[in-house]
């Protein structure tokens, strides 16, 4: 595709460096919406809203909002799924080939700026970083569904990955291909799940929710491992194509996600199975919820 071949990641990077304040404004406006949007929408519509936390999305899927909102969400989620599938088909095979042909160290720690900022791989890495801005639309859709509050994990994940991606694309990172490959792969499945749920088939895909969350947790585990590996190589003197500031941010991001996604998984899928048995007044038993 011509627009992929003509991609100039260097120009995009330079623009992002010159306009680094823009990501601050976007993040500030987004956070203001997180805390005021649901209340404002509830006042306008006269509804109290409802909060529903879906395991994979940190915010609910399926059944809420008007028909127009649900249709828009189907198209939105399908678009993100298709986008992620295209990204996966380019970035993930490249990472796997690099590991098989060059070894884990070279694939993780050798920074090839030409591959990072140009070529078809560079295009999908670049648009991956930029895609964290439109992905904030997820939150707007949750508010339009009538959610009265937005889960911490939902908005924390969105705003931190946006800031991290902007920083990483500006400084360059040999490890960012791991971030893109894993995120693209998981999002290919996750957003398809949400699209099907919004079509009215939540009961069909619901059994797959815990497995999607497990994939997300494994993504965070691998992210922590890759970052710690890069830190170790940098400390031992062999070096790694990641700056220390970026590695620290990346480790903090992945470690916090690992904790939050694991906590969500336990609350959504483990604790309900071990809920205490309650006794009714008539002597019958039921599992408490």
Swiss-Prot record:
Q: What is the lineage of its organism?
A: Eukaryota, Discoba, Euglenozoa, Kinetoplastea, Metakinetoplastina
Question: Would you identify the family this protein belongs to, as annotated?
Answer: Belongs to the ELO family.
Q: Name one GO biological process term.
A: fatty acid elongation, saturated fatty acid
Keywords from UniProt, A to Z, are: Endoplasmic reticulum, Fatty acid biosynthesis, Fatty acid metabolism, Glycoprotein, Lipid biosynthesis, Lipid metabolism, Membrane, Transferase, Transmembrane, Transmembrane helix
Name used for this protein in its record = Fatty acid elongase 1
Subcellular location per the Swiss-Prot or TrEMBL entry: Endoplasmic reticulum membrane
Give start-end ranges for the coiled-coil region(s): none
Question: What is its pathway?
Answer: Lipid metabolism; fatty acid biosynthesis
Q: Do you know which PANTHER family this protein is assigned to?
A: ELONGATION OF FATTY ACIDS PROTEIN (PTHR11157:SF105), FATTY ACID ACYL TRANSFERASE-RELATED (PTHR11157)
Q: Which GO terms describe its cellular component?
A: endoplasmic reticulum membrane
**Organism annotation:** Trypanosoma cruzi (strain CL Brener)
EC number(s): the record gives 2.3.1.-
Q: Which GO terms of the molecular function aspect are on file?
A: fatty acid elongase activity
Q: How does it sit in the membrane?
A: Multi-pass membrane protein
Motif HxxHH motif: chain residues: 154-158
Q: Which reaction does it catalyse?
A: an acyl-CoA + malonyl-CoA + H(+) = a 3-oxoacyl-CoA + CO2 + CoA
Superkingdom of this entry's organism? Answer: Eukaryota
One Pfam family, short name please?
A: ELO
Gene name per UniProt? ELO1
Per the Swiss-Prot or TrEMBL record, the active site comprises 157
Residues with glycosylation annotation: 282
Which regions span the lipid bilayer? Answer: 22-42, 72-92, 123-143, 152-172, 177-197, 208-228, 251-271
What does the UniProt record say this protein does?
Involved in the synthesis of fatty acids. Elongates C4 fatty acids. Required for the normal mitochondrial function, energy metabolism and growth of epimastigotes.
